[in-house]
Design a protein with these regions (language model features):
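P-loop NTPase catalytic core of nucleic-acid-dependent motor ATPases
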Residues: 20-37, 41-46, 106-189
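Intein modules and their embedded homing endonuclease domains
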Residues: 1-124
Length: 189
């Protein structure tokens, strides 16, 4: 029989598998993205084509595979612009909390708590390239080589160590008050 692609069904299939357009805030041009469990990754026409062709290999339908392999127009930007534009709320640090992203979970850090959160429960999106390439593991022991190093460069002075820890925390934290932008300058004695 004749193979006919229903454009709307093809669009729905791609969106059901996480492919969308995204227009960055203040931008005029969109990019293609793939969303998986609140993680967003840039994608391209080539990666979308590879996804479709690999899917067709898995379902073992070479007739449709050959059709798509020949019909490059389905993977051009002009055709893929049919994808819906996704409205994205990115998780951001607040005055009272910061987030770090690991391979196995996100971690919400507040003054008195470190809380692992599954990405699906995060309540917003995260760029996949913001993920630290290791798994998060909660540690009961708070001593480590880095903490010893910071204490040593502060001459084991508790007050200086707290100041250095506060400075490092300030620089790592994503929330900034734009009316307060101090320069951090370190010098030795």
């Amino acid at each position: 029989g004749t193979i006919k692609i229903v454009h709307f069904s093809f669009k729905e299939f791609l969106e059901d598998n996480g492919f969308y357009k995204y227009c960055p805030e203040g931008g005029k041009h969109y990019v293609f993205v793939k969303v998986t469990n609140n993680l967003i990754d840039h994608t391209s026409e080539k990666e979308i084509k590879d996804f479709i062709l690999n899917y067709l290999i898995k379902i073992d339908d070479l007739t449709v595979y050959n059709y798509f392999a020949d019909q490059v127009r389905f993977f051009r930007e002009e055709f893929l612009c049919l994808l819906s534009t996704i409205d994205i709320f990115f998780i951001e640090d607040t005055k009272d909390s910061a987030y770090l992203y690991y391979q196995n979970c996100a971690v919400k850090i507040t003054n008195d708590k470190i809380e692992p959160i599954d990405y699906i429960d995060l309540g917003g999106y995260v760029w996949k390239d913001h993920i630290i390439t290791r798994k998060f593991k909660m540690c009961e022991d708070i001593s480590c080589d880095y903490k010893t190093f910071i204490s040593n460069i502060c001459a084991n002075d508790i007050e200086r160590t707290k100041t250095m820890e506060s400075t490092i925390g300030f620089m790592m934290h994503g929330y900034k008050n734009l009316s307060y932008c101090p320069a951090v300058i370190l010098n030795d004695e």
